[in-house]
């Protein structure tokens, strides 16, 4: 079941995001030392409370049998576009369609809020994730290398 994040869910969501993103960090040699701004290391309760209270981001969780097992959020932009943030599924819940449900829910919500496109950022070297987004309607639009990350940022876009 996909539902909106409640305030009391925030600490659990932070742990869920960390647990999900740390698998990517481990696979691609991303550490707190070489990429302190990577989601696995930079996410915090305060940051998610800020997203909820100050930025009013739509935030969603997937819940199965009382367990919060997936998360994502949207950053709505003034140009009619939005950005998908922190799509995460706990490792033990992967390959069950939860990520796809969250992604499709995000597409629907973004469109209902007047967005005409969704932008998505990934670790470009994660070709499995890139292919998954492409299979779910996103188009790869480019890459960018930042000095503060030991990986290349990949960008995808889905017209809504």
Provide a role label for each language-model segment.
Residues 116-130, 134-136, 142-160:
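C-terminal "cap" of GNAT-fold acetyltransferases
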Residues 87-94, 122-124:
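A short, internal acetyl-CoA/4′-phosphopantetheine-binding micro-motif in the GNAT/acyltransferase core
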Residues 97-99:
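Conserved G/P- and acidic residue-centered "switch" motifs that form tight phosphate/ATP-binding loops
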Residues 4-10, 15-86, 90-91, 103-105, ...:
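Acetyl-CoA-dependent GNAT
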């Amino acid at each position: 079941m996909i539902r909106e994040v409640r305030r009391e869910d925030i600490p659990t969501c932070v742990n869920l995001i960390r647990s999900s993103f740390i698998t990517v960090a481990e696979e691609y040699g991303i550490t707190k030392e070489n990429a302190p701004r990577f989601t696995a290391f930079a996410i915090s309760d305060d940051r998610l409370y800020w997203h909820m209270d100050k930025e009013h981001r739509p935030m969603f969780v997937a819940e199965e049998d009382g367990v919060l097992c997936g998360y994502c959020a949207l950053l709505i932009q003034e140009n009619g576009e939005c950005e998908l943030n922190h799509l995460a599924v706990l490792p033990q819940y992967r390959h069950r369609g939860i990520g796809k449900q969250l992604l499709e829910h995000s597409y629907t919500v973004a469109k209902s809020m007047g967005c005409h496109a969704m932008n998505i950022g990934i670790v470009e070297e994660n070709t499995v994730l890139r292919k998954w987004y492409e299979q779910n309607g996103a188009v790869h639009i480019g890459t960018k290398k930042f000095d503060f990350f030991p990986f290349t940022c990949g960008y995808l876009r889905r017209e809504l």
